[in-house]
């Protein structure tokens, strides 16, 4: 009898446990459905405060969707998305670009916005994973007080002996702006536009000599050094350079006459996002005429939608020559090789 009672108790406990776990499974499915219908969105962003403040409140007002914004650096955010891939806590990653994320595209959902048709030809979503929304091209920031009448219009001008030791440049192995500036000079000086050609790297050798060993530790030090008059010219992003112009500093922004690179500041939908439809609405909103034009008129990032008006402190789009053969996917695949070549040429210059 005692044995039967024990057996009954065990079976009862097993039944309860099974019911509990079955209930948990059912609740998870219900939770997913509830989450999908919620008017909320979690955005992981590494963008500037000004850009976040332009886009997020406007999106909330227009859609009624509440945005939970997590702000951090690009590296930590990408690591977070990767660590959460089996149970995504975020819906959108608003950081980095294809060059940085190509090898991790399995972390993201394929989505091409209907607004993609309205973007510049070089800024369309060609992969399905990365949606270019704005661009921060690499430019020259020229201190007009120091440059005087000196011609600084393109990469050949940077080899002027008068600029030796007066060029602010970072380390392409550690600085994203320096790496993109390196890519621009490689495409500009490469034979038939080939960034791996001997001609491209011969130019790099001469450029390294004119920098005269003064490679800076951060992107910020480059544009600040030029604006403060420590250097005559710096190779940097357009955003900070245009900000100095906007604020009245004695500098000007120069897009190299040989060509410019427009790395798209992309937005990605996280694979398995709990609020997938809201995430798609966010991407659509980012590319909309309203937001692209507002950014062009008030900020110093470059909108990528066709026909958008820009503030007078921004260089008009029709005055910028773009490299037609620039391939962001190719650059992403060959980045390690290019950085290794840079390090090799830098080391050779010191011997």
Where would I find each of the regions flagged by the language model?
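Short, polar/charged alpha-helical segment
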Residues: 41, 45-66
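A ligand-binding cleft/hinge motif common to bilobed small-molecule-binding domains
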Residues: 99-103, 227, 232-250
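Extracytoplasmic ligand-binding site segments that recognize negatively charged/polar headgroups
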Residues: 45-52, 72-76, 82, 88-230
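Short, low-complexity disordered leader/linker segments with a strong preference
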Residues: 1-40, 349-351
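Extracellular/periplasmic bilobal clamshell ligand-binding domains
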Residues: 312-351
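Mature extracytoplasmic/periplasmic domains
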Residues: 260, 265, 270-325
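Short beta-strand->loop
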Residues: 109-117, 130-131, 156-159, 249-261, ...
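Periplasmic-binding protein-like
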Residues: 136, 203-208, 215, 245-271
